[in-house]
Structure formats: C-alpha cells, structure tokens
C-alpha cells in the first residue's frame, strides 16, 4: 500500500478519535518526553506519543511510538492509560504481512509495564478473519473506525 495513502488514512482515524474524546470531555496534551505515561492527568490524551519500553533483545530502554495514549477520567485497575494504534489496510495480503507487529509491540509493553497492559487497534479497511483471530489470540482488542463508541468498553 502507498505510504501516503496510509498516512492520510491514519490522520482521518486520529481525527475521528479526537472528536470522540473531545465530546467526552478529554483534553489533548503534548507530553514531555520524560513524563511517565502512568502519570498523565486523568481525562487527557496525547497523539503520536513515544512510550518507553525495555527492548527484549538488548535490555536497553527504547521509545515505542504509539498513535494515541488516553488517560481515562477514572483510572483503570491496571493504572495504565489506554494505548491505541490506528491501522488501515486495503487488502488481506498487507494485513497478513504486518499482523505480528502489533503482537510484538504488546509483548514489549507487557514486559515493561506488566501482563495486564492492553493495546487496542483502531481499524479501517480490509482486515480478514485470520488477522482478527491472530490478534485476539495474542490478547489484542480492536475497534472498528465506524464504531468508535465501542471504545467505551475499554474504559474511556
């Protein structure tokens, strides 16, 4: 898929998420690089946030880009913000090549922040049943772009 098209689609997805969060009283912030995301003020969100994780291979701290980090108005039991990745695909071939990326991201997040860490995919386009089954087996939830209100069940 053309990266320019994918970037445009991600921008549209993030705009849908911003509108949804703004309507629920959330405030967008740009977080300082040194701020631990667990210390985000409740009711805030940040787009294109680098989240520090420990690299499983090197043991070194590295930054993982996350499309949207949301600190719910009421803290969740895991005391972590909700991490959302915007994903779009035009065909099944593209999704099958990339499906392990999200699982690897979640594994690094869980190695750093604990087994209860969650990653939510915000999907638009073609995602076949095999892709969705794979992500579910890895413990990754998803919400379709046209059903943004389903994020309510994630604690937003």
Name every feature range the model reports, one short phrase each:
Residues 25-35:
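Short, well-structured beta-strand/strand-turn elements
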Residues 1-26:
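Interdomain/boundary linker segments immediately adjacent to catalytic/signaling cores
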Residues 35-156:
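Catalytic core segments in nucleotide and nucleic-acid processing enzymes
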